[in-house]
Structures are given as C-alpha cells and as structure tokens.
A protein has these predicted regions:
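Low-complexity, acidic/polar, glycine-enriched regions of mature
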Residues: 1-151
Length: 151
C-alpha cells in the first residue's frame, strides 16, 4: 500500500508492506493496515504522521471491510476484471461507507488486486495544523496492490 500527497510546496509519499488482507470465495474481503507500518523518506514526516495526524497510539490500524459485487469463480479465467469493492473504510477511528473501483485477476494460485482511490483527511477527523496545511494535499491518493494466495 502506498499513499501520495502532492502540493506546489512538497510531495509526501509513504509505503506500507505490512498490510494483511483476506478475500473469500463469495467476494467478502477485509484489509487491515498497521499505521506504524508506513515508511516515509524523512523520519520527521513519519514521526508527525504517527504522533500528530493519525495518532497511531490511539488508532493503531486502518481497515476496509466489505464485499465485491458479482464476484464469482468464473473470474478465474486469467483476465483482469473491473469490480466495485463496497464496504466500510475506517481511518483514525472514523468509519465511512465507500465504493472503490478495483481490478482483480486470477494468477493461477490466487488473486492480484489493484485499486487507486482518494481519501480526504478531513473526512476522517484528521486535523492538519494551519502552519503546514499548504504542504499536505486536501485529498491523498492511495494505491493498493495485493497478491492474495488461495487457501
């Protein structure tokens, strides 16, 4: 998982390779993201992210749980399928219903999932101090790429 914020003043990017995910045969899914797992180019950005914005000591995980409409075994054809993941996105303790366009593709041993969507910090009660507000975009681009192994 990766997020990216761009403004004329500064770009901010972080990656997290500690995400756990589950996709069931009926299309039900769950993603869990440990907030402390995000890594930034600058240590100070990471510290501010965890202590001041996401408050990882209080809200240690983000999550997205729901289902993919019309998810069937017929999708195991090796082709890429556009789907809509519907569920509850929880960030900073705030739940929000979301519909996120995604692609799924059977790779022979499991599912490759990709999605790009935006999150507004204000929608999740994440307060950005006025002094740095022009350095953080009002919407953050989130990219998810996951390979889920069938069990």
């Amino acid at each position: 998982m990766r997020f990216f914020s761009t403004t004329p003043i500064e770009d901010i990017e972080a990656e997290n390779h500690q995400t756990t995910a589950l996709l069931q045969a009926d299309g039900a899914f769950a993603f869990r993201v440990p907030v402390l797992g995000f890594r930034f180019e600058k240590a100070l950005m990471e510290e501010h992210f965890n202590e001041n914005y996401l408050e990882s000591h209080t809200y240690p995980n983000g999550s997205f749980e729901g289902s993919i409409d019309d998810f069937t075994d017929a999708m195991k054809d090796g082709e890429s399928h556009d789907v809509l993941a519907k569920g509850v996105l929880t960030i900073h303790g705030v739940e929000q219903q979301r519909e996120i366009p995604s692609t799924v593709q059977w790779n022979g041993t499991g599912w490759d999932i990709e999605s790009v969507f935006t999150v507004a910090p204000a929608d999740h009660n994440i307060n950005i101090p006025k002094v740095v507000r022009n350095k953080i975009a009002p919407t953050i681009e989130v990219t998810v790429q996951a390979n889920l192994i069938a069990r």
